[in-house]
Amino acid sequence: EMSVLTEAADMEVVLDGLAALAKIDSNNIFLAGQSQGGFVASYIAGTQPEKVRGLVAIFPAYVLQDDARKRMEGRELPETEEIMGLLLGKIYAEDATSFDIYDVIKNYSGPALLIHGTADQLVPIEYSRRAVEVFPSAELVEIEGAGHGFDRADEDRAINLSLEFVKENIL
């Protein structure tokens, strides 16, 4: 019964647990995620902005809501469905279409870094381009020719960009 909202609920538990630890500076918690993880991290940043110092989303799957709507169009959802090799319950599509991620992320005014390949066929870069127009304080780094999932050189670049972003934005 996995969905973006169940993953978000799991992340909320982790965030609360981290904030309760004496050794953790709860004013400096950064979220990062790739693909659906970037979507979920963005959702948490938008719904609980006071808990998030910074956000890094790498090829975030903002397309998944449109994909779910297309799968639902003109038919009743089956109890389970195989999507990208995963057997998912209908809650996956129901939860994905129950809100608009762009309405959520506009609530996060902290620093955000999006990293996306220009040749991503799974999640077209236009979704991240739209997101940086919606986030109050976001930057998009486009990696020329990169697809969904980076090769080693592009992955290293994304890691270095992410680390630099955290260093620049930590309190």
Regions found by a protein language model. Give the residues of each.
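Alpha/beta-hydrolase active-site loop
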Residues: M2-L21
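Alpha/beta-hydrolase fold nucleophile elbow
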Residues: I24-G33
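Gly/Ala-rich beta-loop-alpha elbow adjacent to hydrolase catalytic centers
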Residues: G33-G37, A41
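Active-site nucleophile elbow and catalytic-triad environment of alpha/beta-hydrolase enzymes
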Residues: L87-V104
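Hydrolase active-site cap/lid region
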Residues: T47-I91
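Short alpha-helix in the alpha/beta-hydrolase fold that links the catalytic acid
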Residues: G110, P124-E133
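Short beta-strand/loop motif that positions the catalytic acidic residue
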Residues: Y108, L114-H116, D120
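Catalytic histidine-centered segment of alpha/beta-hydrolase-like enzymes
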Residues: A146-R157
